[in-house]
Amino acid sequence: MSITKVSPDLVDLDSGITITTADNTAQLTLISTDTDSGIGPVLDLKRNPNEAGADADWLGQIHFTGHNDAGTPEDIVYAKITGQIDDASDGSEDATVRWYIMQGGTRRESLSLGPSETVINEASVDKNFRVESDGNANMLFVDGGEDRVGIGTASPSTLLHAKGGSASSIIRVD
C-alpha cells in the first residue's frame, strides 16, 4: 500500500485500510475538539468528489459482518445500510436510504426511507410490525403472515381488529 499526502488535510491511499485490535475496544474513533454548537465529529461517505452525480448512483454502504457456524466459518454480511441518489438534478436532489437484514439465510430489505415514501418490509416476508405505547405493548400490530392489523391486540382475528379495555371506547368516528 502506498500513502500519498495530497494536501495538509488529505491523504491518498492506493488500497483499503484494515484496523485491527485484539480486544473489544473501538477500532476507529473520530474526535472533534470543536466546542461550538455545531455538529462534530462527522463521518462523510463521499463518492467521486468533483464528479457529477447521476440518478441511481450508490453513495455508500455500511456492512455489519460476522462469521456463521459452518465447518469453515464464512464471512456473512448480517446487516447493511445503503445510500443511493434517486434524482441528481440540481435543486431537486432526492435520495433513498435502505436497511437490509439477514433472515433465513437471505439478505432482505427491511426498511426504506425515500423521498416520497417510507416502506417497511418491501421484500414482503412473513414479518410482524409492532408499535408500543406507554401502556400497551401492542398499540399497533401488523401480522405479516396473516395480513391483519391489530389495535390493542397482538392476535387480530379480522383484517382490522381493534381491542380496548372493558370500560373504554374502542373506536370513535365523528
Predicted regions located by residue number:
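Short, intrinsically disordered N-terminal pre-domain segments
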Residues: 1-14, 159-160
